[in-house]
Structure formats: C-alpha cells, structure tokens
Amino acid sequence: MKNTKPKVRLWSVLTGLTAILTVAAIVGNIIANQYATTINVALNASTYKIIHGENTGDTEYFKKGFASDEEREAYEAELCATVEAEGAALLKNENNALPLASGAKVSLFGHGSVDLMYGGTGSGSVDTSKAPNLKQALEAQGITINQTLWDLYSSDSMMSKYSRMTPASISDTLEANTQYAVNEAPWSALSSAESSLAEYGDAAIVVLSRSGGEGADLPSGENGTSDNWISGQEGDGNYLALSAEEIELLQNLKALKDNGTFKNIIVLINSSNAIELDFLNPEICGEDYGIDAAMWIGDVGQTGINGVGQLLSGAVTPSGSLVDTYLYDNMANPAMYNFYTQAYPNAAEYNLLTEGADVQGMYSVYQEGIYLGYRYFETRYEDVVMGTAKAGDYNWATTVAYPFGYGDSYTTFAYSNFNVTESDDAFTVTLKVTNTGKTYSGKETVQVYFQSPYTDYDKANGIEKAAAELCGFAKTDVLAPGASEDVTITVKKSELRTYDANNAKTYILDAGDYYFTAATDSHNAVNNILAAKGYTLTGAKMKEIQAVNACRRDAVAKGMKLEEAMDKWQTMEQLPAEYRS
C-alpha cells in the first residue's frame, strides 16, 4: 500500500493557503475600492483615457480667469477681505468708540488677539501660513499697536501655558472631540506690560474667540454643557459663556478706563458659535464692564482680518447682519435641551462604545421642528403680545441680546415708499432707502420678511408657521449722506409654501392674508406686522399686555376658563389691583 500522507498534508496546506488568499483578496478588494481615489493619487495612476475624435472643438468648458496663480491668489485675498468687511455685524457703538481715529494707539487683549479663529474644523479649516494677523491688519490702516503687550501674548511661555484647548479636527474618540477650554491668561500674567498701557490708551480691544465645528462638536452634557471640560481654568462647563479669566480681564480694563488709562473698550466676537452676550448689558449681567463697542466678526477666513481693520478704522462702514439670534443665556433656547448625545441601544453589542470608536455609537434627537432660532423667539413673542393661549411667561427683551438680522452702522438710514405688487408667480417689493446721517457713507442691508395665515386647517393638521420668515434681502450701493437708492426684491410665491406632512403630503399655499415688511432684523419685522394688525407696541403697552396675560394665566390656573378670562380682562384698567403695579 502506498503512503498518501504527504499528499494529504500538501493538499491541506494548499487549501488553507487558498482560503487565506481568498479572504485577503475579498477584503483587499473592498478596501481598494473604498480608497481607490487615495491609492490612485499615491501611485500617480490615471483612471481615464482621452480619445480625440475628428471634431476638435473647444472642450475647455471652464476657462481660466487669471493669467497666473499669483493674480488669482491676490484676487482671492481681496475677495475674502471684502466678504468679511461686508459681513461683520456692528452690535454696539457708544461714545463714538468706533471708528478709531486716524493714528490711534491701541492695546490688544485676549489670547485670541494673537491667535485668531480663522476658520472652523473639518472642511471649514483654513491654511493660516499666509494669513495676516490683527496687528498687521490694523497697522495697514494707520493704527499703532502696543508692541510690548503683543510680544507678551505672543511669547512662547504665554502661548504654551495659555492657549485655547480644542480637540483634533476629526477624531474617532468622543472624549477627544469634547476637549474644549478657553484657557485665557489671568490678569496677573500681564503685569510686565502694565506700564505700557497708558501710551496706547486710545482703546483697549478685546478679542473673544471660540472654536467648534465638523467632527468637533461643542461639549454636550445633560443641559448642553459638559461637566468634564471647562470654559476657563475654573469654569462651569459652559464653553460659550465668558470664562472667569475673561471676566477678570474686563473688570480690570474697566478700572483702567475709570482712571483714564483707556478711553474706550472695544470687544470683537471672533466665533461662528453663538457666545452668550449678557456681559454687553449691565442690566442683565448685573455688572458694568464699561464696554463701549462690540462687533461680531465670526471666523475671518485667510485674509478676512484685513476687512476687520478696514471696519475698525472707518475705511469701510459696517453693513453686515447677524445670521443667528444671540441670547443673554443660551439655556433660554429650548433647542439646547436636544443638544446631547446618547448611545444606540445596541451600540455595545457592535463594540461602538469602545475607545477609538465611541463617536459612531452616539446620536442626537431633534424635536424643535421649525422653531429653531428666530422662528422660535419671534413666534413666541407674537403669541405673548396677542395673548395667544399657552404662550406662557416669556419676556423677549430679557432673553434676546441681538435678533437675527441685526447689524448697526456708523450712519443711519430711513425707509420710504414701501410697496408690494403681485404677479402670477411672485411678489415684488420696492422701497426707497436714504442715508440720513451727516458724516459717513455706507451701505444698508434691506431684509424682507413675510407672515402667512395660520388657518384652522393648519392647526388641525399639525402645520406649524413662524410669526415671520426671511424671504429676501438686498444691499444698497455705498450711499453718501443724504443720498437715496430704490431697492427691488422679488419673492417667488413658491417660497411662501408650507409642507403639509400629515394630510396633503406636499407643499401647500394657504388662502388668506399675507403680510410683507421690510425691516432691519427679525424682531422689527414682527413688530411691523403686529402694528399692521393693530397692536401698538410702546413700552407701556408691552407692560400692559404682559400684565393682562399674567392675570389671565393666573385666572385659568384658579379655575376660570380661558375664554372667560380673555373676555373679562382686556386692558390694564380692568385688572385686579395686584396686577396693576
């Protein structure tokens, strides 16, 4: 009998090797397909072939607009600065703090002054290797900077000890994506530069910077904050509030302003995430930090800081508008309560909660529907003013610091000749804008809002509508003092539709009264619409409305039907005495 064991062993080895190679080929094929673009780039492999036919027409569909890369880069740099100069929003300007006088000598404070937020995270990041800084931008406009203070903030010792703590742009670890800290330098760390401040006392410019974006969400605890990561060395976990060190900085600058060292205090909001702005209103925060001017500059892009220099110097008059509603306390926004992460029920089963993979095992639930941002704050405001059922206790003035669309100017503008005409598929809004100031030329951003009818059908079918919605905007040319311009904004009727998810399963356009208004921001838009409905909103009237509504709610709580309470008390004079204080 022949010995067959060697053949059996050989076939076993070959079978095992074949199985391994098969698995490797399958896995390799999947990986290769998934990363085909990266592999082709690394190997310089071409994935296409150009075959020229008989027709040799021009196939260069996208023509070069520049003679050289240098020309293109110069254009892009100028464009970025222009976008910033046209988009930054002036929030506050008292005592003629802005623009800075020609030749002004100023001191720059805050770690953000030497380490600006140029862009966001992930795909929003910016190459800063060629980006100018705030000092260069101001010097280009003839402003002199306190070099001693600048050198101190820029020193290796300060940068290593008091730099922002931000997570990696993209990380697979949930913990790594929530490691945020402002880490501002304490006032004591600036003592070596204190003797230089008086010489550069035309203004103290404070830069408040915050990061956050794609792949690096802000801390999200039970209430939209993190207990594990701090806003400052001794913060409370609220990354979008001022840290203890930032408050200390403002307090000391106020003291220096009071003793005459500084003429003005100017704050730059260098963040695309909405920082709480209670510190700009002494009545809200309970302390006066002596801030004369504040400007939201967002993330400035590669060369946008040059636009900020133009704004601060008065070379350009601010004409930008806020794209968010800024609050005194972000926890007043109900959407904050949806800003948290929780694990999928089967996340542990698939090892999605282990270190290095835990961001894949989390999710957030959104419940706010259309009531996000100004659609919530302005709709609830109108409900309170009109005494709508279930409006609850709500005071817009102590909640909202600056509404959506807000943006001040160095000059003033007036609107006139407002008119709306209708065509088959659109409404055309026209008005006249006049620069009523006497000193500065500038542009004005005209915003058009609408309100659609809130019908019984809408209520029956769960269709929600906001008190006002932005439907168009336009910016004037630069208007000299006394000059005017006619502005035309076209609104397509299709943009007024609402989605009916429960019944029609499509977009609908309700019959009824539609209100259009041109306004400087979302809040003024709602007030214009309320005035058109017959509500005159003086301060006294607002107090009356709030008092009447409070009395109605109290009456309902004590057993009176809402309809009876509304019929019984319509004015302040009709209220019980305890509500008339």
Question: For each of these PLM feature ranges, what is it?
Answer:
Residues 1-581:
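C-terminal non-catalytic regions of proteins with extracellular/luminal or membrane-system context
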